[in-house]
Amino acid sequence: EEKLKTALKVNAPEYFPVERRDDRFKLLQATCALPFLFPVFDIQGKPCMDGGAADAIPHDRALERGCERVIVVLTRERSYVRRPEKLQPLIDAAYRKYPRFCDTMRRRADAYNTSRERLFQLEREGRALLFAPHSTEGFHRTEKDVEKIRALWKDGYDEGMERLDEVQAFLSGS
């Protein structure tokens, strides 16, 4: 099992094995440390933050490691297209010690959209099975409303149950 994080100085995603002895869950915290909301984490001497900054949909890693097919759960609708970061000037100021991270954030929308198109191509080829919410309208990545979270979870759960035969066929290669 691996966790993805963004190494701020090298402008790249990095994957780390999950150590069972990490009693403070430092690596896990770093993998979801959103800019501005969390501090920069030091992992093995490297400043790190949210893995999604460098690799928002990390399906290529599975393919590079020998998987022939992937199941991907998207957190946004299939139609979602990421726009350039409105807060880029703030990112540049807040993370000026990490210019490569700022570059990553500047290119994040293009990288996400390219990754998304690649996933759709893999899906057409029968090499990817995608799940995506029907709607995330009114839902924010820092959502605290338990009912909204529960409703979005239930939507995903229901779709998973409805598509169970499709998942089993995909996994068996038929």
Listing of model-derived features with the role each one plays in the protein:
Residues E1-S174:
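Patatin-like phospholipase
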